[in-house]
Amino acid sequence: MSDLENKIATDIESYLKEHENKQLLRFITCGSVDDGKSTLIGRLLHDSKMIFEDQLAAIKKDSKKVGTTEGEFDLALLVDGLQSEREQGITIDVAYRYFTTDKRKFIIADTPGHEQYTRNMATGASTADLAIILIDARYGVQTQTRRHSFITKLLGIKHIVVAVNKMDLVDFKEDIFNQISSDYLKFAQELGMTKDITLIPISALNGDNIVKRSEKSPWYKGDTLMNLLETIKIDEDRDLVHFRFPVQYVNRPNLNFRGFCGTIASGVIKVGDAITVLPSGKSSTVKEIVTYDGNLDYAYSQQAITLTLNDEIDISRGDIIVKSDEQPDHASNLDVDIVWMSEEPLIKGKQYFIKRATTVTVGSIDHFYYKTDVNTLEQSEANVLNLNEISRAKLDLEQVIAFDSYDKNKVMGSFIIIDRITNNTVGAGMIRNKSEDQSKKDSIYSDFEIEFNALVRKHFPHWECKEIF
């Protein structure tokens, strides 16, 4: 049995207790096709002894059929789970894997390198604390490297590790690593990525500088990849100042209890704090902070809690509870960045459901400011947005919502776009700011026309009738 299987088999309770309080780091791997992303994750899983023996046996068997390495087994097959991925030797879907060390827990998202799977990479990056961008030492910074760096910046990932892989194929030459480092840092500066970028020379296939320092690169004085992942500071990434609490569920098991359930998006709340409910603007104070393990005196970002208040206020799912002295901005017209994920193009004026945290409303694109070519990063005019394209646009909502910019608060500043007919998620967006023009145009329609329009939109949504004012 493997070390992991032995621990679980002998004392599962102590194993779970040992790991439950460790800090969690979510990270993604991205880079050009065949840069070794899946192999790197396989190496991390293998060297951290997080593979069951039956998994290892299956991988060894599959390696003989579809393996791409000359070794005993292909580490990439630990991650490439889809049959089409194994046959093509590429990653298509976002593959999530979990492992743990003595210091920290990890969730890895292995994202596709191909341009046609940009939406998949955006999905994997949306919850990541850190991104590992792989560069093949033989080829240096490539078009896909630039694309993935742009997406990590777009999605607000604060910590970047550039892993220069396959250094064994260039004999771990220091000058090659230094040249790639210089090229990438120059590009990152042009992109506005100036904080927390670390470069590491590695060989994912052989394990050099992954968990143990390699003797082949005595000139490299920095941390190994694993040591960096275990020690990088992510606590300060959380906003513990501005309290935001999207109400997910109103819990009323009996006449004597009415609690508001959800997960704190940011900030800290204490019993007795003055709060305001948005969009109604009604105020109260916190009576109790209830959890499964008992009541708390205070709670903070990412904790799931139930709040009770000292006053009877009408609150429902989708409302936002904030501290009265720390209120967010509010608007119905927003400047947003959109990643389009549907084969049906995004058209100006077409109405979609817009879901931000627990708030759901209806909205449409008023106009596109520009779209960005993810390969050249050039901006151009746009009338529609096609699959995998990214655009800055003006989003018009049917109701005013409270929001923070995505850069300040990912939960309050992100949303998904849902097709009103199929209920498919067709896009994702990041709120950058409120639009300069918040006024509604003077109506050119009669009261009857406006009421009839509302009736048609309510009972015949498949007609995709646009709202008039």
Swiss-Prot record:
InterPro entries according to UniProt: CysN_GTP-bd (IPR041757), CysN_II (IPR044138), CysN_NoDQ_III (IPR044139), G_TR_CS (IPR031157), GTP-eEF1A_C (IPR054696), P-loop_NTPase (IPR027417), Small_GTP-bd (IPR005225), SO4_adenylTrfase_lsu (IPR011779)
Pathway(s) this gene product operates in, as recorded in its UniProt entry: Sulfur metabolism; hydrogen sulfide biosynthesis; sulfite from sulfate: step 1/3
Keyword match Transferase: yes
Residues that coordinate or bind GTP: 31-38, 110-114, 165-168
Region (G1), start-end ranges: 31-38
Top-level taxon in the UniProt lineage: Bacteria
PROSITE patterns, alphabetized: G_TR_1, G_TR_2
Entry-linked Pfam families: GTP-eEF1A_C, GTP_EFTU
Gene Ontology terms describing biological process: hydrogen sulfide biosynthetic process; sulfate assimilation
Keywords of this entry: ATP-binding, GTP-binding, Nucleotide-binding, Nucleotidyltransferase, Transferase
Catalysed reaction, written as an equation: sulfate + ATP + H(+) = adenosine 5'-phosphosulfate + diphosphate
GO molecular function: ATP binding; GTP binding; GTPase activity; sulfate adenylyltransferase (ATP) activity
Region of interest (G4), residue spans: 165-168
Segments of this protein annotated with the region G3: 110-113
GTP-binding recorded as keyword: yes
CDD domains assigned: CysN_ATPS, CysN_NodQ_II, CysN_NoDQ_III
EC number(s) on file: 2.7.7.4
Stretches the record annotates as G5: 203-205
Domain tr-type G, chain residue ranges per copy: 22-238
Region (G2): 89-93
HAMAP family: Sulf_adenylyltr_sub1
NCBIfam families reported for this sequence: CysN, PRK05124.1, PRK05506.1, small_GTP
Assembly information from the UniProt record: Heterodimer composed of CysD, the smaller subunit, and CysN.
Job description of the protein: With CysD forms the ATP sulfurylase (ATPS) that catalyzes the adenylation of sulfate producing adenosine 5'-phosphosulfate (APS) and diphosphate, the first enzymatic step in sulfur assimilation pathway. APS synthesis involves the formation of a high-energy phosphoric-sulfuric acid anhydride bond driven by GTP hydrolysis by CysN coupled to ATP hydrolysis by CysD.
Family membership noted in the UniProt record: Belongs to the TRAFAC class translation factor GTPase superfamily. Classic translation factor GTPase family. CysN/NodQ subfamily.
Name the UniProt record assigns to this protein: Sulfate adenylyltransferase subunit 1
Organism field: Aliarcobacter butzleri (strain RM4018)
